[in-house]
């Protein structure tokens, strides 16, 4: 069976990645094991005290960004956005959450190598979604380690093993690789789907049908030397 590998870059504080989760779920439901999704992180909100006041300087700064996010959410009824987002809770960086999630992924992969249950094999995505909901829906600061540990533990992750990977530096190394890969592949922002060994990149608010068409074309003509028409 042909397998399409998709590298999926996102920033955990990006509303478009929060919205795109429904498309990720649809891809998994339609294609199953024919698609191998590789979650990776890129840095869009790495320094929010600089980014938001600068980017939104002439548009109301945090209040303007808050209004923008709430207006965006109105177009997508499958997601919820807290009315006080970025007003009462302002994570200084997405990097803290990315680091923790990278350690979660490392732990999960190790468990899979030891014959983990199907439930354990899904913990990374459960924690990732819990982080996004905690921020966008519940207005919690997911840059805080105590919040991260609480959410991970509730999802069934081994918090001690996860923190070990942060303390010994292995999670830092893997996250650095993600950021370097994003630069090397010229990832423009979050979310970005990279297919066909980097030949195809889908960036931003991309509809499921476009993602589906690209995957179907690669399944039809999987050879690495064949360029997709999509």
Question: How should these model regions be labeled?
Answer:
Residues 1-7:
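Extreme N-terminal starter segment of soluble prokaryotic enzymes
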Residues 8-9, 13-39, 118-230:
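C-terminal cap of thioredoxin/glutaredoxin-like
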Residues 21-134:
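Structural alpha/beta surface segment adjacent to cysteine/selenocysteine redox centers
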């Amino acid at each position: 069976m042909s397998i399409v590998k998709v590298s999926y870059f996102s920033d955990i504080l990006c509303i478009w990645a929060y919205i795109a989760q429904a498309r990720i779920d649809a891809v998994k439901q339609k294609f199953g094991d024919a698609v191998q999704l590789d979650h990776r992180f890129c840095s869009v909100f790495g320094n929010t005290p600089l980014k938001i006041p600068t980017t939104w300087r002439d548009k109301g700064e945090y209040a303007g960004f808050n209004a923008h996010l709430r207006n965006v959410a109105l177009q997508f009824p499958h997601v919820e956005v807290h009315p006080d987002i970025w007003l009462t809770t302002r994570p200084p960086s997405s990097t803290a959450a990315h680091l923790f999630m990278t350690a979660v992924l490392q732990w999960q992969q190790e468990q899979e190598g030891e014959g983990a249950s199907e439930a354990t094999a899904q913990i990374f995505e459960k924690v990732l979604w819990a982080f996004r909901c905690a921020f966008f829906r519940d207005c919690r600061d997911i840059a805080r380690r105590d919040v991260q540990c609480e959410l991970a533990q509730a999802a069934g992750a081994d918090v001690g093993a996860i923190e070990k990977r942060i303390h010994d530096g292995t999670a830092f190394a893997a996250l650095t690789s993600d950021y370097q890969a994003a630069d090397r592949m010229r990832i423009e922002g979050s979310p970005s789907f990279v297919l066909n060994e980097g030949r195809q990149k889908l960036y931003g608010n991309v509809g499921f049908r476009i993602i589906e068409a690209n995957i179907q074309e690669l399944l039809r003509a999987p050879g690495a030397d064949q360029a997709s028409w999509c």
